[in-house]
């Protein structure tokens, strides 16, 4: 009998019933909520006269629309204010635990879940947000859902899904100096494309993945959606268990021992068969920078902007040409010659304590370049912010000319006051570089925290290995 993949084990252990069309009703262990995709779901419950089936299995956080500046004043934007106040009211009415805008635990939902122990190995977890795949780093089956599905989980704690195919992405070898988890996932997307993972559940494995911290694994799983997959995961090991140990909502005592014994089985069997296997070698991965309007438009920092005329695929060549026109770039331009206007260190991809330490190590004792109009550091949560301030990282950034902000999604997306103006170019640790993602007409270059911090100091990207 063929062994099971990690995805198979997680799926099979949560099937309530199977249907003739190949779909299955899955039990959902945890749902995370935020102010943008939950209002209609709560209103659906209200209109139907229903209550959440398991209220304690839900946690709400305000993150997308919250201002990252002074929070002693009311939220200025009327739409954002209504969404935040609506979440507050809905959570009160339905008795859902919420980390509101003034709660010290508030932050980006995909940072808060793991750090609070709300996300645990072996769980099924959903959220009305595509980057829910982040939580798969803990050996969980985690994926984003739509608002109607948010309501369905609130009402029934179940969801109908079709099982995905499986893909193993194996990264063997050791990472070179200056190469991080962000570079790994950008290199993967550059290799398989933004549609390469469509229809698959991704599992990341190999020596380089096992060597990463939990926060590095979260960065990789976070961007599974940019590779076209709804979910990505890493098998449980000692790193996973030590990360979870002592978290506020983690099991304790005998329950902890029982949980760990169960979690140890959350690995793919040696004889498990994947539908597709992709292999990269760690020593071939260099610091990455995106140059276009899709995460797959990426290259090593020491390369040049590619020429669409040299692309044999006509469709891809047209897409490259459009991207370069939007980005205001000429083919053949060294990536290190592109000047930046703004800097953003934050997002659910790279706003955890290790990310801030990585950036601060580059910034320490230096100053932001004169051509940089604004440099933001936005911690992923109040817990991260407090820890960073305890380590003095805030002073490192402030002394260098950065702004030190309150937790939130911030400049990752143009839904709050932190955004790009038309034509502005930003070096960003976030996950998407689509047209207008950070503000109408804004131009986004994705890179690791260290690379973005170095761009702030030099005014343009540099190879941090030099």
Swiss-Prot record:
This is 3-isopropylmalate dehydratase large subunit. Pathway: Amino-acid biosynthesis; L-leucine biosynthesis; L-leucine from 3-methyl-2-oxobutanoate: step 2/4. NCBIfam families: leuC, PRK05478.1, PRK12466.1. Binds 1 [4Fe-4S] cluster per subunit. Its EC number is 4.2.1.33. It catalyses: (2R,3S)-3-isopropylmalate = (2S)-2-isopropylmalate. HAMAP family: LeuC_type1. It holds the Pfam family Aconitase. The keyword Lyase applies. Keywords: 4Fe-4S, Amino-acid biosynthesis, Branched-chain amino acid biosynthesis, Iron, Iron-sulfur, Leucine biosynthesis, Lyase, Metal-binding.
């Amino acid at each position: 009998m063929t062994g099971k993949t990690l995805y198979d084990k997680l799926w099979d252990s949560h099937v309530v019933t199977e249907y003739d069309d190949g779909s299955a009703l899955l039990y959902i262990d945890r749902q995370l909520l935020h102010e943008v995709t939950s209002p209609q779901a709560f209103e659906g419950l209200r209109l139907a006269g229903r209550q959440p089936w398991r209220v304690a299995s839900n946690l709400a956080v305000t993150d997308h629309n919250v201002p990252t500046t002074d929070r002693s004043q009311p939220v200025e934007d009327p739409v954002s204010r209504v969404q935040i106040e609506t979440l507050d009211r809905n959570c009160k009415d339905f008795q859902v635990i919420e980390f509101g805008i003034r709660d010290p635990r508030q932050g980006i939902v995909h940072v808060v879940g793991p750090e609070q122990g709300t996300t645990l190995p072996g769980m099924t977890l959903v959220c009305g947000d595509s980057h829910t795949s982040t939580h798969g780093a803990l050996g969980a089956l985690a994926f984003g859902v739509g608002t109607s599905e948010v309501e369905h989980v609130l009402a029934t704690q179940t969801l109908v899904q079709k099982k995905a195919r499986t893909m193993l992405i194996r990264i063997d070898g050791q990472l070179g100096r200056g190469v991080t988890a962000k570079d790994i996932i950008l290199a993967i997307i550059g290799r398989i494309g933004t549609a390469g993972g469509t229809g698959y559940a991704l599992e990341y494995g190999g020596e380089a993945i096992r060597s990463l911290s939990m926060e590095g694994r979260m960065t990789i799983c976070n961007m599974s959606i940019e590779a076209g997959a709804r979910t990505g995961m890493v098998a449980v090991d000692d790193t996973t268990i030590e990360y979870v140990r002592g978290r506020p909502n983690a099991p304790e005592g005998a329950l902890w021992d029982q949980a760990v014994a169960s979690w140890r089985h959350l690995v793919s069997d040696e004889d498990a068969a994947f539908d597709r296997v992709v292999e990269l070698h760690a020593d071939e991965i260099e610091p990455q920078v995106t140059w276009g309007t899709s995460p797959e438009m990426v290259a090593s920092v020491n390369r040049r902007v590619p020429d669409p005329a040299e692309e044999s695929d006509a469709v891809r060549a047209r897409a490259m040409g459009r991207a370069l026109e939007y980005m205001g770039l000429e083919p053949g331009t060294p990536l290190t010659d592109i000047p930046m206007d703004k800097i953003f260190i934050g997002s659910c991809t790279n706003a955890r304590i290790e990310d801030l330490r990585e950036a601060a190590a580059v910034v320490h004792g230096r100053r932001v370049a004169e051509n940089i109009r604004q440099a933001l550091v936005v911690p992923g949560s109040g817990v991260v912010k407090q820890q960073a301030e305890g380590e003095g990282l805030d002073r490192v950034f402030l002394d260098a000319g950065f702004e030190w902000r309150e937790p939130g999604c911030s400049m990752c997306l143009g839904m709050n006051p932190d955004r790009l103006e038309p034509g502005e170019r930003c070096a960003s640790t976030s996950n998407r570089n689509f047209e207008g993602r950070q503000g109408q007409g804004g131009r986004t270059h994705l890179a690791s925290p260290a690379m973005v911090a170095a761009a702030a100091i030099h005014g343009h990207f540099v190879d941090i290995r030099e």
